[in-house]
Amino acid sequence: GLSLESFIRNALVQRTGSHVKLWEFKKQLQKAMEVLQMDPSYAERDLNVGFSGGEKKKSEILQLMMLKPSLAILDETDSGLDVDAVRLASEGIHVYQQENPDSSLLIITHSTKILESLHVDYTHVMVNGHIIATGDASLIEQINREGYEQFKEQM
């Protein structure tokens, strides 16, 4: 199979059009894995083979951190994660934001926990396929205080 490390390295070559020196790539990969508290042995494992749900989510954040896309859509990245894993995923996303300030993220979630340490420019609330509220990070605080019911009533 294809190892996680090989997958990311090949994807990086495809994305950038240039080869990164192996030692430099491994150093960057190790640094990103440390942020996510991933054991270095995960880099050698076959991509998504035998990974738990949490390990797959960490792998996705690792790919985000390494490939540095200008736009990323994170759909339910926090789904099924325990509190510690959500914190680590959020930290990885935060590091990505800091290192790529001109990038854009669309984070789809039912829980606001993953958003707490991130810089949020816009918040949209969607009910039944319709955006019914838009605001800044203060909208997240309002949701945490008052819940989603207030928005469902607007439909």
PLM-predicted stretches and their roles:
Residues P101-D121:
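Conserved H-loop
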Residues Y122, M126, H130-E153:
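Conserved beta-strand-loop-alpha-helix hinge in the C-terminal portion
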Residues I73-T77, D84:
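Walker B catalytic motif
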Residues D82-R87, T134:
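Conserved D-loop-proximal element of ABC-family nucleotide-binding domains
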Residues V86-P101:
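Helical segment within the ABC ATPase nucleotide-binding domain
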Residues D78-G80, T112:
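Short loop immediately C-terminal to the Walker-B catalytic DE motif
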Residues G1-S70:
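ABC-family P-loop ATPase nucleotide-binding domains
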